[in-house]
Amino acid sequence: MKLYCLSGLGTDERAFKHIHIEGVELVHVPWIDFKENESLQSYAKRLFEATKPEDDYNLIGLSFGGMIAAEWEKIKTPKTLILLSTMRDTKGLPIYIRVAGALNLHKIVPMSLVRYPNFISYFLFGITNNENKQVFKDILHDGDPKHLKWAMNSIANWRNYDKSNGIRIHGDKDRLLPMKKGMDHVISGGGHMIVLNN
């Protein structure tokens, strides 16, 4: 069985390095180039068309990738959909993201704060051990700063009011995207990067 994996903002397939499921082949979906002023919905549609998953595909989305997954679900419903550390619709986004989007505050965030993690980044993402800190650091450092900037803007302006039917897994100590009620599985003590830590 194939499981298509959509990673988070600024991350790649290394975010899923600890996931090993017998009989399951992880298919990591690489990000494609974005178009100027492109919406998250439009990008998700082009990414889906570029990936061409089979009819009965299975999908897992992490953080930003979970938002992309929610858009894929509207194009073709997956057999199984798992949403990790993410929100299934716009209403689930924290108020600080919605305010930042309304005021365009996300556009003035220096990329150095995003690409070069420090103790604040590790705190927000809930990354504690040195091995995972190094993995996280390498992933962000290798990311495309222009893609990061675009993705931050697309999240801040995401408009999706269709609630996904995916299986939602969230850490109850997620500081970046605080957990909402109604999660299917709660990871006790888990931060935003439960996929690495838990």
Label the predicted regions:
Residues 1-55, 89, 105-111, 184:
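Active-site catalytic motif of lipid deacylating hydrolases and related acyltransferases
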Residues 60-69:
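Gly/Ala-rich beta-loop-alpha elbow adjacent to hydrolase catalytic centers
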Residues 112-159:
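Conserved alpha/beta-hydrolase catalytic His-Asp/Glu region
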Residues 77-110:
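Flexible "cap/lid" loop of the alpha/beta hydrolase fold
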Residues 168-174:
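Short beta-strand/loop motif that positions the catalytic acidic residue
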Residues 37-38, 176, 186-198:
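Catalytic histidine-centered segment of alpha/beta-hydrolase-like enzymes
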Residues 18, 71-75:
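Active-site signature of alpha/beta-hydrolase-fold catalytic machinery across serine-
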